[in-house]
Regions:
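N-terminal substrate-binding region of glycoside hydrolase catalytic domains
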Residues: 56-75, 95-100
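Glycine-rich, proline-tolerant flexible connector loops at the mouths of alpha/beta enzymes
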Residues: 67-85, 138-143
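Conserved, mostly hydrophobic/aromatic
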Residues: 57, 65, 84, 112, ...
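Histidine-acidic metal/acid-base catalytic patches
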Residues: 2-23, 27-41, 48-58, 127-129, ...
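Short amphipathic alpha-helices and their capping/turn segments at secondary-structure boundaries
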Residues: 74-86, 117-129, 242-252
């Protein structure tokens, strides 16, 4: 760990105070059963905001949208923000996507950081409060199957010593490198995020990193900074641990949510597959209780297919009320 990152990680008292003390990360099953006090808001994901997209949102009861197009100019992003505001809608998040913070080539790591800065500026122009960032990925090396991961790591340094009962030294090294490089990169992005008022939401998207709830939560909390949080996808992690366990572990570090469903099949290559919301293995009633327990109020973007926008809207209403 270099001195700059070490000092950043251990001197975040001001930001930590601003963020407040963590809520209890665990809660008993059966608590928070309702009526719910937390308020969830539904959003669609679209590439750009156009009049046609505005109509879809308003016709189907979506007050917000998450946008994806990184090729727009800041002027175009500001125009989209004006369109949304004129229609009583909110561009709540900007999907910055994959950033190759752990590339072996230092030039590529630098490019990823600069791309992150550009995306932060676009998010600000859109009026989004959060930018979604996937902070690296690993692949092409031997690693455990999803259900076989048993991580052992130093809670202070987050360095992994074991990935599973069997030995996977290449994976352990890759995970440790990814943690260090991601910490370096995100720490460099934080000053701009703070200046712009845009939170960096770190998400796992089948990137084979931070694969257990406690480890992912420790990684997010290592920054000790209010501008670095978790963008949790409720479907991406089911093959590693139930979605409600991810919610409880991440707790008040969750800044935004994606929703999709996943059908477990431990004999399959990926131990399952994505399916329509409601057709999979996720216990959405337990997830809703967990969100209430950790006090999450905020946006939930649909990242799923198989239903119409109107059907998804009705499904979200059922999820929000704890009836899905």
């Amino acid at each position: 760990m270099n001195i700059q990152r070490r000092d950043f990680l251990i001197s975040g008292a001001t930001a930590l105070a601003a963020a407040g003390l963590p809520r209890m990360a665990r809660c008993a099953e059966g608590c928070c059963a309702g009526p719910f006090k937390t308020v969830l808001k539904k959003a669609l994901i679209r590439k750009r905001l156009t009049p046609d997209v505005v109509k879809v949102l308003k016709d189907n009861g979506y007050p917000g949208v998450e946008l994806q197009d990184k090729s727009v100019t800041e002027a175009e992003a500001r125009a989209a923000r004006r369109l949304a505001e004129d229609e009583g809608l909110r561009i709540h998040s900007f999907m910055g996507g994959w950033l190759d913070f752990n590339a072996k080539d230092p030039a590529k790591r630098r490019d990823a950081i600069e791309a992150g800065k550009k995306n932060l500026r676009l998010a600000s122009a859109y009026g989004a409060s959060v930018i979604l960032v996937v902070p690296g990925r690993v692949g092409g090396i031997p690693m455990p199957r999803p259900s076989a991961f048993k991580l052992a790591y130093d809670p202070k340094t987050l360095m992994l010593s074991r990935a599973a009962d069997a030995d996977f030294p290449a994976y352990v090294q890759a995970q440790n490198d990814a943690t260090k490089y991601a910490q370096d990169a995100v720490c460099e992005l934080v000053p701009l995020a703070s200046e712009l008022g845009v939170t960096i939401g770190l998400e796992n998207v089948w990137n084979n990193l931070w694969v257990k709830p406690d480890f992912a939560a420790a990684f997010i909390r290592s920054f000790k900074n209010a501008w670095v949080k978790s963008y949790l996808d409720l479907g991406n992690h089911e093959r590693y641990a139930p979605a409600q366990e991810w919610v409880r572990a991440l707790g008040d570090q969750i800044v935004k949510l994606h929703i999709k469903d996943f059908k477990l099949d431990r004999a399959a290559k990926n131990e399952g597959a994505f399916v329509r919301i409601g057709d999979g293995s996720i216990d959405f009633k337990a997830v809703r209780r967990a969100l209430e327990c950790v006090g999450y109020s905020g946006w939930v973007s649909i990242e799923s297919s198989g239903w119409t926008d109107a059907e998804h809207s009705a499904i979200m209403d059922r999820f929000f009320s704890g009836k899905l």
